[in-house]
Amino acid sequence: MRKFTPKFVPRRKNGPVEEKDVDERVKIEFDVESQKKWKASRPKPEIKLTASGPFALGPNASSSGTGRPIGSVYVPPPNVKNEEKDDALSKLAASSGHDEGHDEDMVDILKLRELNGQEQGKTDIGGKDLLVPIITDRMLPESNDEKLKHHAESAIHTTVINKEDEEQERVALDLQSLAQHLGLTEQEGMEDHFKDQMVLMQFPDKLPRFMGDADVDPVWPSSEVKEEEAGEKTDVEEKKDPDKHGRENGNIDDLTSLPYPAFHPPAGQIGVLRVHQSGKTTLEMGGVNFVVQSGSDCLFLQEIAVVDYDSKRIWNLGSFERRMIVSPDF
């Protein structure tokens, strides 16, 4: 089988350039001037739209909207045959006239049937003056259920707003009382701020003996003298000392929930508190030096109370502002 080999043709370097023949029809078709001519000669079609009746819009509409006035004669458009039967709706509008009010867009069905020649009796229509709306742009009246629903929604909205206002007032009062307790409010001076404040000092479990002239076990009056008239005898009534009879079981009388304290500090001065120039605070008590340091604040409220075991009463002295830790300086 012989193999196909294309013939090599040398490229023309010099000589006239070949031009392709242009089709004259294509040239004329895309000519702008000729295109304008046949576009301008094309006639525009005339569209004639006619309508009549109560639902028609335009010059032939018989309703009370824009267009032909009520009671005018119906004029058919050109090239349209005139209808044989008369426009009953236009007669009805001309006879009834135009009244200002809600009956502007209403049609009386009974009169309309009489003008059209229809017999009444096929449909039972209750009421003599039955009006049917055709075209209206008015708002429909709300029913009783809708009114009650709107009143309920407005009442709920008002209640929610009142609850939110009460909650905001409560939060504002809480923040104000907390700021006063923490001392964040504006004070007249620093002296007034730190005046009459109690400080809680936490001591170790064991303390040194107190040295001094104070009586460790003072004697309290155990008798009561009643004043009587002059010349008569005086009766002395002895009263039991609760300190002597209540220390055996650790309780006083029947107060099982209030234990009697076993430690009785002496009356008088128990130590000396020194504040150094460097800012260090020490406490000398019983010949032992203690270091006083600031403690951490608690997140809960702490108050000081004094308990009277005899009268079963408690006195609240208030809350302390600062907490100090006392530890021995070895």
Curated annotation (Swiss-Prot):
What is the species listed in this Swiss-Prot or TrEMBL entry?
Answer: Schizosaccharomyces pombe (strain 972 / ATCC 24843)
Which residues does UniProt assign to the signal peptide? none
* GO biological process terms, semicolon-separated: tRNA transcription by RNA polymerase III
What's the protein here called? DNA-directed RNA polymerase III subunit rpc4
Q: Which portions of the chain have biased composition (kind: Basic and acidic residues)?
A: 15-36, 231-250
Q: What is the lineage of its organism?
A: Eukaryota, Fungi, Dikarya, Ascomycota, Taphrinomycotina
Q: Which residue ranges have biased composition labelled Basic residues?
A: 1-14
GO molecular function terms here? DNA binding
Task: List the GO cellular component terms.
Answer: cytosol; nucleus; RNA polymerase III complex
TM ranges: none
Which Pfam families does the entry mention?
Answer: RNA_pol_Rpc4 (PF05132)
Coiled-coil region list: none
**Entry superkingdom:** Eukaryota
Tell me how this protein assembles: Component of the RNA polymerase III (Pol III) complex consisting of 17 subunits.
Which keywords describe this protein according to UniProt?
Cytoplasm, DNA-directed RNA polymerase, Nucleus, Transcription
| Protein localization | Cytoplasm; Nucleus
Return the annotated region ranges for Disordered.
Answer: 1-103, 212-254
Gene name of the record: rpc53
Function description: DNA-dependent RNA polymerase catalyzes the transcription of DNA into RNA using the four ribonucleoside triphosphates as substrates. Specific peripheric component of RNA polymerase III which synthesizes small RNAs, such as 5S rRNA and tRNAs. Essential for tRNA synthesis. The RPC53/RPC4-RPC37/RPC5 subcomplex is required for terminator recognition and reinitiation.
